[in-house]
Regions:
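Cysteine-centered motifs
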Residues: 20-21
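N-terminal catalytic or cofactor-binding beta/alpha core of small enzyme domains
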Residues: 11, 29-169, 182-191, 211-235
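Hydrophobic, aromatic-enriched interface-forming segments
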Residues: 175-182
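Extreme N-terminal basic, low-complexity initiation segments
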Residues: 2-4
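Conserved TIR/SEFIR loop-to-helix hotspot centered on a Trp-containing motif
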Residues: 172
């Protein structure tokens, strides 16, 4: 992992070029650049890797002048949101983008909505298996992503990669963390934008499976994420 001071210095250098000014001018303005927290889940369901975090790790530390903060979170209903909360409190990001695996999907999909429901088809990594439970008793039935979903999809496609909008994040941990981060933003961080991106299986995962499944190389998944984030930063 790169030293954070080094990352910040590179960020200042890029911004100085972009805005035709001195690095010292940018350093004097601590709010001059955006912070984007990007999370990815650990492996679950018997898989040895999770393409979500593997792709997140490949993201540049700076995208369009924004600092990218990368974080692995557990595929656990209760613990995942607590770790994201800690990171939000510590880093004060402008944007939170959670990334998860949706095996069977053919490309990267940007989620539009999360629902107030946990209904696990398989146990999470802590053995928890909620059935028809509300995620937040006092929360609304659903939250819409506050990211520019269609612009994200369009920018990925503009770079020659497949991408689409999804209108269901499921009822597993992916939906849970998307809903709860949006709930956190609505209650405590009204200026923070948040949303979710699902990625397909990696080519590595499906190589030895008994039946053919849609997949993408990790590097292509990472590029798709990068282009999606570009659209968020440019908005």
């Amino acid at each position: 992992m790169m030293d954070m001071d080094y990352i910040k210095e590179k960020l200042y250098q890029q911004l100085a070029i972009d805005y035709c000014c001195q690095i010292s001018d940018i350093k004097d303005d601590k709010n001059h650049f955006m912070k984007v927290l990007v999370t990815g889940f650990d492996p679950f369901g018997g898989e040895s890797v999770n393409p979500a975090y593997e792709a997140v790790k490949l993201l540049p530390d700076i995208i369009e002048g924004a600092q990218i903060i990368k974080l692995e979170i557990p595929t656990v209903f209760k613990k995942s949101i607590e770790i994201v909360k800690e990171a939000v409190e510590k880093d004060k990001p402008d944007v939170v983008i959670n990334v998860g695996q949706a095996g069977g999907r053919a490309c990267v999909t940007v989620e539009k909505v999360a629902i107030n429901l946990a209904d696990a088809g398989i146990p999470d990594n802590a053995g928890d298996s909620p059935e028809d439970e509300s995620l937040e008793k006092d929360g609304p039935d659903a939250y819409f992503s506050t990211l520019p979903v269609k612009a994200m999809v369009e920018n990925v496609r503009a770079h020659g990669l497949p991408c689409s909008v999804s209108y269901s994040a499921g009822t597993y941990v992916c939906n849970s963390v998307m809903y709860r981060v949006l709930h956190l933003a609505a209650r405590s961080y009204p200026n923070m934008k948040a949303g979710f991106i699902h990625v397909p299986y990696s080519s590595e995962q499906v190589a030895n499976k008994d039946r053919p499944l849609a997949s993408m190389p990790i590097e292509i998944i990472a590029k798709s994420l990068e282009h999606a984030i570009e659209a968020v930063v440019k908005e």
